[in-house]
Amino acid sequence: MTIEIDEERLRKYLAERLGETESFSLEQFGGGNANETLALEWGDDVYALRKPPVAEPAPEMLHGLLREYEILSALEETWVPTPDVVLACEDESIIGDIFYVMERIEGDVLELDEPERFQTPEQRRRIGAETVDTLSKIHSIDTDRVGLSSFGDEGTDYLAHQVEQLTAQLEWAQERTAESRELSVCFEIADWLADNVPKSEHHTLVHGDYKLDNIMFASGTPAHIAGVLDWEMSTLGDPLADLGWLLSYWTEERDPSPVTDDIEEEYSDHDYFPMLDIYAEEYSKFTRNAGYHRREELVNRYEKQTGFEYTNDRFYRTLGVFKLAALCEGFYRMFLEDAPNTKESYPLMELMVPTLGRQAKQIIDGETPL
């Protein structure tokens, strides 16, 4: 979908704040399912313009755009690598919505594969270390000092609130998607989570979506994080939820396939079944390569960095997979309703969400140990 923006109006607005320039361009970035990003060139400077999506999988699942601006502003004087913010605009008449502009950082995001320069055991080891060390920095932020002490509203009930919110998201999506297939396994996961919410021992800043494809690694070697991106789900809460989310994406060779026999039997004739292998089997599979930390090693490093003990692993990783399933079911509803910013991958969610349900059950049943 092409985003229509009055570029002349935007140019005038920016000129008043950044100074006049003869060179100006605005292009849409691909990827992402939440806030939209556009590449902005202003003279010799390059920026990223962030704006809300035309439609969301469920508005209550994502925090406001200006919250993201607020946290990036607060983190500029910390050890957490983030893009510097430039300006925020609450005047919707400029581009048709609120927006903010931030520094555009260069490098590579690791999603389906790793760049050639990182394809050695030494660089892979650094990727794991950098990823965990940066997460530890996020969880060590003094929120009072940076002005974020009232950033979240869930209090000590963060985990219970997450389970309730995600279950509500799934139920909302199923109002439209239930006619396509049943998701009893996902609701069983929701019940298990509700019955097994642990007591949170720590309350810190949490990113909410911390994983490799939201981390920009700088160009060159050694592997080094240039910036942590996509803070729209950040809040104050249980830091172990961030770690569990990261671990749910970090695959190992011993992990069973989430494409179980019953999934294959039910969907093997589906037009999108070949794509399921890419998303369910190949996504982040490179973390199985020689040199990458195992999940247990990541946990050990995190515990040493933060002093937090990672307990209740099955709950936190299952919560991570369930969170992804609930969000993906929202994307599937968007596809069925032909929402304005529906992406090409959204039809696949018909198959992906039941598969995620099986993956969560594998964690609960101990088939995918830490």
Model-derived regions: residue spans:
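Active-site activation/catalytic loop segments of kinase-like enzymes and analogous catalytic loops
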Residues: 241-306, 321-337
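Conserved catalytic-loop position in the HRD/HxD motif
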Residues: 209
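Protein kinase-like catalytic domain
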Residues: 76, 139-142, 229, 247, ...
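ATP-binding pocket architecture of kinase catalytic cores
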Residues: 27-204, 219-223
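Juxta-kinase regulatory segment immediately upstream of eukaryotic protein kinase catalytic domains
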Residues: 1-24
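ATP/Mg2+ or Mg2+-diphosphate-binding catalytic cores
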Residues: 2, 285-313, 324-370
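Activation of the activation-loop gatekeeper triad in protein kinase-fold domains
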Residues: 228-234
